[in-house]
């Protein structure tokens, strides 16, 4: 491991210390909560910063694993139009990532979904078995 990889691993561990990034792939439906900072100017001329969170839910159509510059592309349909947004995986702007549904696909990049609409754009759901515990048996 060279010095750049070591430096990247240190930064990734610092950025993920207070948040958990789940394992997800292309085809999974995720809900990404993003931190948005609004600037407003008050009557007395002072600048006021307000922080809020916004959820963005859609299908992951591409994932790019490149160390600290890793990102993923999420596509959703909003008011009949397809909207895509790329999120940096380790960005401090990304507050949380939740996997809503796991999908079954046979490709790493799902760019073909851009030309599809309706039923042909659906992705089958992959069911993850729940670990059997003593409480589940009782």
From Swiss-Prot:
<dbReference type="InterPro" id="IPR038657">
    <property type="entry name" value="Ribosomal_bL19_sf"/>
</dbReference>
<comment type="function">
    <text>This protein is located at the 30S-50S ribosomal subunit interface and may play a role in the structure and function of the aminoacyl-tRNA binding site.</text>
</comment>
<protein>
    <recommendedName>
        <fullName>Large ribosomal subunit protein bL19</fullName>
    </recommendedName>
</protein>
<dbReference type="InterPro" id="IPR001857">
    <property type="entry name" value="Ribosomal_bL19"/>
</dbReference>
<keyword id="KW-0689">Ribosomal protein</keyword>
<dbReference type="InterPro" id="IPR018257">
    <property type="entry name" value="Ribosomal_bL19_CS"/>
</dbReference>
<dbReference type="InterPro" id="IPR008991">
    <property type="entry name" value="Translation_prot_SH3-like_sf"/>
</dbReference>
<keyword id="KW-0687">Ribonucleoprotein</keyword>
<dbReference type="GO" id="GO:0006412">
    <property type="term" value="P:translation"/>
</dbReference>
<dbReference type="GO" id="GO:0003735">
    <property type="term" value="F:structural constituent of ribosome"/>
</dbReference>
<dbReference type="GO" id="GO:0022625">
    <property type="term" value="C:cytosolic large ribosomal subunit"/>
</dbReference>
<comment type="similarity">
    <text>Belongs to the bacterial ribosomal protein bL19 family.</text>
</comment>
<dbReference type="Pfam" id="PF01245">
    <property type="entry name" value="Ribosomal_L19"/>
</dbReference>
């Amino acid at each position: 491991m060279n010095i750049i990889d070591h430096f990247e691993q240190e930064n990734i561990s610092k950025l993920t210390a207070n948040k958990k990034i789940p394992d997800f792939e292309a085809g999974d439906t995720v809900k990404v909560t993003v931190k948005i900072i609004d600037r407003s100017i008050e009557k007395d001329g002072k600048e006021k910063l307000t922080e809020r969170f916004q959820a963005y839910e859609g299908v992951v159509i591409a994932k790019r694993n490149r160390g600290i510059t890793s990102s993923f592309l999420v596509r959703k349909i909003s008011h009949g139009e397809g909207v895509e947004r790329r999120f940096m995986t380790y960005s401090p702007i990304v507050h949380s990532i939740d996997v809503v549904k796991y999908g079954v696909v046979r490709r790493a990049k799902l760019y073909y979904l851009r030309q599809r609409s309706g039923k042909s754009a659906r992705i089958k759901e992959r069911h993850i078995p729940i670990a059997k515990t003593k409480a589940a048996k009782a």
